[in-house]
Amino acid sequence: MAQNKPVKKIVLAYSGGLDTSVILTWLKDTYGCEVIAFTADIGQKEELSGLEEKGIKTGASKVYIQDLRLEFARDFIFPAIQGNAIYEMRYLLGTSLARPLIAKAMVEVAEKEGADAFAHGATGKGNDQVRFELGVKSLAPEKTIIAPWRIWSFGGRSDLIEYAKSKGIPVPVTAEKPYSMDRNLMHISYEGGILEDPYKEPDEKMFLLTTSPEKAPDAPEYLELDFEEGNCVAINGKKMNPLEIMETLNTIAGKHGVGRVDIVENRLVGIKSRGVYETPGGTILFLAHRDLESITIDRDTQHHKDKLSIEFAELIYNGHWFSSRMKAVRAFITETQRYVSGTVRIKLYKGVCSVVGRKSQVSLYNPEMATFEKEELYNQKDAEGFINIYGLPAQETARLRKK
C-alpha cells in the first residue's frame, strides 16, 4: 500500500483550502517527511496572496506558486480547439485540460527539489485522480503517488474540520457552498450537492462568468476572429496572445450569456454525473474554428477528422494527454490545420453564438462551382454517370434479392 512505502520528500498539489491543508499536515504525520506545496495559477481568479505564508504555517517546507495561464491557453486549450475536442457532444473539457498541465509542472518541481513522491486531493470517485496520476506515471514513472482520500479514514468535511482544529490548522470561516466548483481560464464547472438532482434547475445566483440570457443586452454584438493554422490570433483586427484571447472572449461572451451547458456525463470510473458548465470564450472559439474548417479542409479529410475528434476528446477526458496514441492523434490534427487560416464573423445575442460569415485566402469554396445560376464549371449532365456507378451496389443488391 502507498502509505507503507517509504518516501523522503513529497510534492503536494495545494490550493490552501480545507482539504489540501489537512492533507499537508496528514502527510507530515503519516510519512514523517518534507512536504513541498505546489499551486498553479491557471486562471481560477482566487486570491493567491498569502497562500505561501499559509502553506509554510501549515507545515510545508516550501511553497511554489506558478503562473501557468499562458501555457495553459497556448499548449492545452488551443490544441483542444484545433482538434474540435468536445466530450459526448456537450463538454468542452475545461477541467480535463488543466490536470495534465498541473501534473507536468509538479513533475518539474519534483525533479528540481529531488522529491520522490506526489500527492493530490482528488477523491476516489472522480476523474481527476486518473488525470493527475496518469500524467505523473507518463512523465515520472519512478515516483510514488499518494492519494489520501483513498487511504485515510476521514468520512467527509466534518471529519476534516475536527482534524484541522486538533492540529491548529486555520479553518475557513466562509459558508460551504451547496455544490463544488472548479474554475480556470477555460471554464467554471459546478457539481454535487443541490445539483445531484438532474431535474432541478440551477439557481441563477450560482453562475459567475455568464449573464442570464434573459438579462443579456437587447442588441446583438458582432466579432471578427482571425485564425492562422487553426489558432485564433486576433479579435476585431487586434493581435493578441492566447491568454489575452481567452480573457477577452470570456468577458464578451459572458456578457451575452453565451457558454452555459447543463449535462449528465459518463465519468471514466463508470458513474453518471451531472455537471453544469460556463465556457463562454471556449464556446466561441470552438464554433468559429470548426466553421472555418468547413471552407479550408477537403471533405474526406474533414470527415475523418470529425470522427477522430471524438477519440481525441475521450483521450483528454480520460487523462491520456501524454500517451503515445495522443501524440499520434495530435500529429494528424496538426497536419490538418496547415490551411485553417482566415476570418470568422460571430454574432452574440442572448445566450446564442452564431457564425454569420467566414472567409479565407485559401478557401476551397468556389462560388462559380456552387451557384444555382448559369453554370460554367459544373456540367449537370455529368451527374448521371456518377449516380449510375455510385448507386450500382444498391441497385444490384435490390435486383438480386428480388429473384
From Swiss-Prot:
CDD domains: ASS. Its EC number is 6.3.4.5. Pathway: Amino-acid biosynthesis; L-arginine biosynthesis; L-arginine from L-ornithine and carbamoyl phosphate: step 2/3. ATP binds at residues 13-21, 40, 121. It comes from the Bacteria. Belongs to the argininosuccinate synthase family. Type 1 subfamily. This is Argininosuccinate synthase.
